[in-house]
């Protein structure tokens, strides 16, 4: 008795007009996630998934490529307007935002949601180069 092959179901195309783009830019990478208003993920991409490795992941160009890829996937679901939440200290923040605008999305608001401590944990030691 052979096992019946499980069929891989393709994701159905949701028709979502507006959403939230979460741009998380660290010193080493840039991650972009586009969600609907409830927070369910529609599409995501990062500089690492675009094929950049090592120190190239932290470049603005890598962030731009990741944002374009994420925007293309979200546009397939019918998304047109975005609120952008930018977080982190990395170099890919502005270029990812510009790439989302250039992809044809209407950006309604831009929020910086970088967590700032009220003197919480001790920071890591300063780099001496």
Swiss-Prot record:
Any one GO BP annotation for this protein: translation
Pfam families xrefs: Ribosomal_S11
Gene Ontology MF annotations: rRNA binding; structural constituent of ribosome
GO cellular component, one term: ribosome
Alphabetized UniProt keyword annotations: Ribonucleoprotein, Ribosomal protein, RNA-binding, rRNA-binding
Coiled coil residues, start to end: none
Database matches in InterPro entries: Ribosomal_uS11, Ribosomal_uS11_bac-type, Ribosomal_uS11_CS, Ribosomal_uS11_sf
Complex formation: Part of the 30S ribosomal subunit. Interacts with proteins S7 and S18. Binds to IF-3.
PANTHER family linked to this entry: 40S RIBOSOMAL PROTEIN S14/30S RIBOSOMAL PROTEIN S11
HAMAP family: Ribosomal_uS11
Family statement drawn from the similarity comment of this UniProt entry: Belongs to the universal ribosomal protein uS11 family.
Role of this protein: Located on the platform of the 30S subunit, it bridges several disparate RNA helices of the 16S rRNA. Forms part of the Shine-Dalgarno cleft in the 70S ribosome.
Name by which UniProt lists this protein: Small ribosomal subunit protein uS11
Source organism per UniProt: Methylocella silvestris (strain DSM 15510 / CIP 108128 / LMG 27833 / NCIMB 13906 / BL2)
